[in-house]
Amino acid sequence: MAENAYSKAGVDVEAGYQVVERIKKHVARTERLGAMGALGSFGGMFDLSSLHLKEPVLVSGTDGVGTKLLLAIEADKHDTIGIDCVAMCVNDILAQGAEPLFFLDYIATGKTDPVKMEQIVKGVADGCEQAGAALIGGETAEMPDMYGSDDYDLAGFTVGAVEKQKLITEGAVKEGDTLIGIPSSGIHSNGYSLVRKIFFKDNELTLDAEISELDVPLVEELLKPTRIYVKPVLEVLKEVDVHGITHVTGGGFVENLPRMLTNDLAVKVELGSWPVLPIFDVMKKYGQLNEMEMYEIFNMGIGMVLAVAKADVERTLEVLVQNGEAAYVIGEVTTRENDAVIFTGGTKG
């Protein structure tokens, strides 16, 4: 086939067609009740009536993966970064009590590599399966003048639904509520500009560096995918009146826990009430960071926090354990005097 004008401009249309064929099997495994239409339609569709909600409220979220992508590109490992993208979106809307319904992805790249694109979308589909969301659409944009041939960016968008009376807002959290923390897998998807600076600029480590405190090579630790909390937390929401949920992302405990509070409330976080993952101690040491800086930037081993009444603590923990989750009572809600987040106790190793 003769090279057309678009190809001469650096856009490989044929490679785009190959990507569509390669990803069909991954998209197919994310099908769920309510999803409509087929891959390749102009718009993704979802039948909201299939949920039989009386007063449905739609909750949307969008996010990317940040500079964690640079590690995936440098390591040439692209099959889990899509999980991160899904996690960052669905965990956010879960914080409002919403069940994720569908997801769309956007990949921008300098050169369309069908094998690489399939790996990325496979990760997105894996994340959608974990979240119970249908992958109903997406876009792969080849822009050779915007990106290098090996570079790409990844972003996602999700929509979920919740009954209006069950929508979780900041006004529901009360003084005396207990904070229950659910573990993270590691750094998740925030703070990677600092992470990369600490390890690869300041300390000049290599991707495959072996650090005694870690049980895997450094890059493997740093690319561990963000946990998706949808299924266990939705099970809790069926049985417990959860007053607040925080997705611990960029800004760590200090920035995120107050997002579920009104201005007259604060949280006391008991340090030492959960195991801090080794990677955080490693970063603290290599980056010469103090403990409070760590809690202002990273999740420190807790990726999601639920606020529940004291009477519901035992049942909440039971449901989480029944759904394969470790969970920890990490603090309580109190009246605010100065800071919105108060740390007490000491770090648990």
From Swiss-Prot:
CC terms in the record's Gene Ontology section: cytosol
Catalytic activity: 2-formamido-N(1)-(5-O-phospho-beta-D-ribosyl)acetamidine + ATP = 5-amino-1-(5-phospho-beta-D-ribosyl)imidazole + ADP + phosphate + H(+)
Record's keyword annotation contains Cytoplasm: yes
InterPro entries: PurM-like_C_dom, PurM-like_C_sf, PurM-like_N, PurM-like_N_sf, PurM_cligase
Organism superkingdom: Bacteria
Cell cycle in keyword set: no
Entry's Gene Ontology BP terms: 'de novo' IMP biosynthetic process; adenine biosynthetic process
A UniProt-annotated Pfam family: AIRS_C
Protein EC: 6.3.3.1
SUPFAM superfamilies recorded: PurM C-terminal domain-like (SSF56042), PurM N-terminal domain-like (SSF55326)
Residue ranges crossing the lipid bilayer per the database entry: none
Subcellular location: Cytoplasm
Pathway: Purine metabolism; IMP biosynthesis via de novo pathway; 5-amino-1-(5-phospho-D-ribosyl)imidazole from N(2)-formyl-N(1)-(5-phospho-D-ribosyl)glycinamide: step 2/2
Top-level EC class as recorded in UniProt: ligase
Protein keywords: ATP-binding, Cytoplasm, Ligase, Nucleotide-binding, Purine biosynthesis
Record Gene3D superfamilies: PurM-like C-terminal domain, PurM-like, N-terminal domain
GO MF annotation list: ATP binding; phosphoribosylamine-glycine ligase activity; phosphoribosylformylglycinamidine cyclo-ligase activity
HAMAP family found in the cross-reference section: AIRS
Family affiliation: Belongs to the AIR synthase family.
Protein name per Swiss-Prot or TrEMBL: Phosphoribosylformylglycinamidine cyclo-ligase
Organism in which the protein naturally occurs: Listeria monocytogenes serotype 4a (strain HCC23)
Lineage: Bacteria, Bacillati, Bacillota, Bacilli, Bacillales
